[in-house]
Amino acid sequence: MADVQKIATREAYGKALVELGKEHDDLLVFDADLAEATRSGKYGEEYPDRFVDCGIAEANMIGMAAGVAATGHKVFATSFAMFTSGRAFEQIRNSVGYPHLNVKIGATHGGLSVGEDGATHQCNEDIAVMRTIPGMTVIIPSDAVEAEAAVKAAYDHDGPVYMRFGRLPVPVFNTNPDYHFELGKGIILKEGTDVTLVACGLMVPVALEVAEQLAAEGVNAEVINIHTIKPLDTELITASAAKTGKVVTIEEHSVIGGLGSAVCQALAENAPVPVKVIGVQDTYGESGPALQVLAKYGLDTPSVLASVKDFLK
């Protein structure tokens, strides 16, 4: 996808907030002193009376968001994935999740692709953590088009939502005029019969590239974009697994508790088939240019292709 336009999903997050603000005066956006980096500041520039910089106090921000949401407003609370899912977990669980409030958490800078920020900021555990909260919807959009649609769907959704966005510009491939985003519904991007590649986030274009290279070797791979990790589209994944007989999950997240774990649980209960989980192993990341870090941890196209081919032997 070398010639495809690349945009970071955090850019789409900021754009979508501004567009929502034009139509909904009940929307408030909070940030924890990272408004420029998260792009929520774009909303603050347009609607300063509906934007609050809460300072470097993520737990306090979530508590404030919960209080405002309890009065009937919808609130997007924004910070880096490491700080929302990590530092503010208790407040998200007890103040947002337990009363099932309309707080939407915009978590940017997720995964290894934060690059130079290093292990302390490369949050590879957020999806696992957020999946455990009852009633929490968890989304990882795959490109800017999907990110914008996800933000708008999150606004319309009744209840808490966790959305992960990235800093790294990624290919914009959801350009089909018929593209439709629906919470909890995966999308078959390529039909196949030999193996199912289930991916999320910036690993979706990688899965498409892997499928293209497999096709050149006579392997017909099905590619599914699972933008909503919870609720998982178990029906779609199960049907594909039953057809192909083999499944590979690909994610920029720990292999523990993320997309791979969710898919394995669904298949164990509905359509047991061999599964390969590709992601960050039981380790921390490290500082370096994003693409180099992804390659070192086995999440670039050549590495994923090699893993899939080894699995298919």
Enumerate the predicted regions with their spans:
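Thiamine diphosphate
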Residues: 1-164, 169, 180, ...
